[in-house]
From Swiss-Prot:
HAMAP family xrefs: Siroheme_synth
InterPro entries for this protein: 4pyrrol_Mease (IPR000878), 4pyrrol_Methylase_sf (IPR035996), 4pyrrole_Mease_sub1 (IPR014777), 4pyrrole_Mease_sub2 (IPR014776), CobA/CysG_C (IPR006366), NAD(P)-bd_dom_sf (IPR036291), Siro_Cobalamin_biosynth (IPR050161), Sirohaem_synt_dimer_dom_sf (IPR037115)
Residue(s) carrying Phosphoserine: S136
Gene (name only): cysG
Pathway(s) it belongs to: Cofactor biosynthesis; adenosylcobalamin biosynthesis; precorrin-2 from uroporphyrinogen III: step 1/1; Cofactor biosynthesis; adenosylcobalamin biosynthesis; sirohydrochlorin from precorrin-2: step 1/1; Porphyrin-containing compound metabolism; siroheme biosynthesis; precorrin-2 from uroporphyrinogen III: step 1/1; Porphyrin-containing compound metabolism; siroheme biosynthesis; siroheme from sirohydrochlorin: step 1/1
Annotated source species: Hahella chejuensis (strain KCTC 2396)
Entry similarity comment: In the N-terminal section; belongs to the precorrin-2 dehydrogenase / sirohydrochlorin ferrochelatase family.
Catalytic activity: uroporphyrinogen III + 2 S-adenosyl-L-methionine = precorrin-2 + 2 S-adenosyl-L-homocysteine + H(+); precorrin-2 + NAD(+) = sirohydrochlorin + NADH + 2 H(+); siroheme + 2 H(+) = sirohydrochlorin + Fe(2+)
Residues bound to NAD(+): E29, Q30, D50, P51
Identification of the protein by name: Siroheme synthase
Length: 469
């Protein structure tokens, strides 16, 4: 038994308005917004309203691009119009405009009154020439806006560049592949593979060269067999701090190599069927040596896999990311790097401790606190500076040595210090003390890792700026 399909209130279509006359009635903010959309579509816009109205005066760009008519509305103004928009603050005038336009068969939109409209403006995700329209048929504009915001985070901003590249190669692909199924398979491999990732990260020239090689056949087999490595910074722990690009690559990877510092909440966002490999990196207990990790990245990519190398924080700040991509470059494996919010920045922000402040600190220094054999050749004398913030990564175990050396080189024992444990996560802890007593406090309270240590006068600002507590 067949089920009758529900009819639509509006048909979503795209209209060519290049060089065509359009009339907007009203001088409100809504009229200005609709005018901007029509101008983006290449229309010639006449606006009926007061040229001195506040909304128009605040939109100088729109005023310079349109003709403002300070006359009362008359149906004769509709001559030669492709579309009409009624956006005045008079319900009676808007209804009059709608009736006159519909009597002449001219598409009309009455703002916030879909029942009087023959067309409505959708919410738009702009990746020109790719445009995605979202509409609730005028019934739930807030819901439409929420849906658009979600889609904005899922569609890379480079989609427009990818569409331009596809159009550029359309004729070449048609000449190379005679059957539509061959062309479809080719474009699917291109748009879901390395070429699209190159475009998304701004390397369009490289993508163009790769497309030429694929079509010529000279390197088609090598391109097909070689995957790519994504070196992605996962940030300090809170999944909401991931970048859009990081999230997209996490969702398309075939295999992920992750460190101990990557939170379970972030791992949950990785593609469900991706193979997961824990490469560890706890203090003195590396699940895999760095050289084996480097070799594994190369091997997996050469198997044609999309390999996600997921690191806590930022891969280029005490993350050994440079070593890993150096070997990838030697092996000729394509890769891209996605920065993450480094632990110093994320933990400081979530603790209410600005790393720099005009009254307290004009510089900040990141230092590794991962000491080997209880010794360190750090330039301690350089750390003892006025108006400077020190941030030690991986310094929990070495905290007694760090405190002792800084005091020995001239830093006051009363210098404010904060230790942030599991920063940006729901169970974040912040322990504040002085350089001379912090090690004892940590021992008494059994603070768990991972931690960030912040030293300097900026720590005193936490009492007023602690927004997470």
């Amino acid at each position: 038994m067949s089920t009758q399909l529900q009819t639509w209130d509006f048909l979503p279509i795209s209209m060519n308005l290049q060089g065509r006359e359009c009339l907007v009635v009203g001088d409100t903010e809504q009229a200005v917004r609709k005018t901007d959309l029509l101008l983006r579509a290449g229309a010639k816009v006449r606006l009926l309203g007061d040229p001195h109205a506040k909304a128009l005066k605040e939109s100088a760009d729109a005023l310079n691009a349109i003709t403002v008519i300070p006359d009362p509305f008359h149906p004769d103004l509709l001559q030669l119009c492709a579309v009409v928009v009624a956006a005045s603050d008079s319900a009676m005038l808007n209804q009059q405009v709608a009736q006159a336009a519909q009597a002449r068969g001219i598409p009309v939109n009455v703002v916030e009154q879909p029942e009087l409209s023959s067309f409505i403006f959708p919410s738009i995700i702009d990746r020109h020439p790719v445009l995605v329209s979202v509409t609730s048929s005028g019934g739930a504009p807030v819901l439409t806006r929420l849906l658009r915001n979600r889609l904005e985070s899922l569609i890379p901003h480079g989609f427009g560049r990818l569409a331009d590249l596809a159009m550029e190669f359309r004729d070449k692909v048609r000449s190379r592949f005679g059957h539509i199924n061959q062309r479809r398979r080719f474009w699917e491999s291109v748009l879901e593979g390395v070429v699209s990732d190159l475009v998304f990260c701004g390397r369009t020239d490289k993508a163009r060269a790769m497309l030429d090689d694929m079509l010529s056949g000279e390197q088609a087999d090598a391109i097909k067999d070689t995957g790519e490595v994504y070196l992605v910074g996962a940030g300090p722990g809170d999944p909401d701090l991931l970048t859009f690009r990081a999230l997209r690559l996490m969702r398309q990877a075939d295999v992920v190599l992750y460190d101990r510092l990557v939170s379970p909440q972030i791992l949950d966002l990785v593609r469900r069927d991706a193979k997961r490999i824990n490469v560890g990196k706890a203090r003195s207990n590396h699940t895999l040596p760095q050289q084996e990790i480097n070799a594994m990245l190369v091997e997996l990519a050469k198997e044609g896999k999309r390999v996600l190398r997921l690191k806590g924080g930022d891969p280029f700040i005490f993350g050994r990311g440079g070593e890993e991509i150096d070997q990838l470059a030697d092996a000729g494996v394509p890769f891209q790097v996605v920065p993450g919010i480094t632990a110093a920045s994320g933990c400081a922000a979530y603790s209410g401790i600005p790393l720099t402040h005009r009254d307290h600190s004009q510089s900040v220094r990141f230092v590794t606190g991962h000491l080997k054999s209880d010794t360190c050749d750090l330039p301690w004398h350089e750390f003892v500076q006025d108006n400077q913030t020190l941030v030690f990564y991986m310094g929990l175990v070495g905290l007694p040595i760090i405190s002792r050396e800084l005091i020995a080189h001239g830093m006051k024992p009363s210098t404010p210090i904060a230790l942030v444990s599991r920063g940006t996560l729901p169970d974040q802890q912040v322990l504040v003390g002085e350089l001379g007593n912090i090690a004892k406090k940590v021992e008494e309270q059994q603070i768990p890792g991972p931690t960030i240590i912040i030293i300097g006068d900026v720590v005193t600002l936490r009492d007023r700026l602690r927004w997470m507590d």
